[in-house]
Amino acid sequence: MGREGRGAEVFSCSMAWERACILATCLGTMRRQLERCIDYARTRKQFGHPIGKFQAVANRIVDMKLRYETARLMIYKVGWLMQMDKSADMDAAMTKLYVSESFVKSCLDAIQIHGGSGFMTELEFERELRDSVGSTLYSGTSEIQRNIIARGLRL
């Protein structure tokens, strides 16, 4: 449990770990979505060309890749900080905020890339979208993460 009067410190440390672990599951889903969208964009044809050749589709996939790689590095940084016994509160909050909101955007992009079929239950994107919205709520809402970051900036 820890020493008396140090509960907030223990809670803060455990929340950083919790956020990092939860975000890893978001990251895994983002990666799977990216891979499925790339495969689909290479094989689905419209007007005689793979849809990945159209800028609108390619740009969405590029944005998904950028969000995924940024999220991955942010999660690794939080894990490294905690492993080194360094304060990770603000980094964990920034990571939670960025990854959860990026997860929602990637889900919306995946649905858009797949068109009408992206919203059907058979492809799982609609379920992943519902799950992604939850990631902005649990373990501290996006607004709470912004408050933690602002406090870390001494605002």
Sequence positions of predicted segments:
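Alpha-helical interface subdomain recognition
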Residues: E4-A8, S12-L155
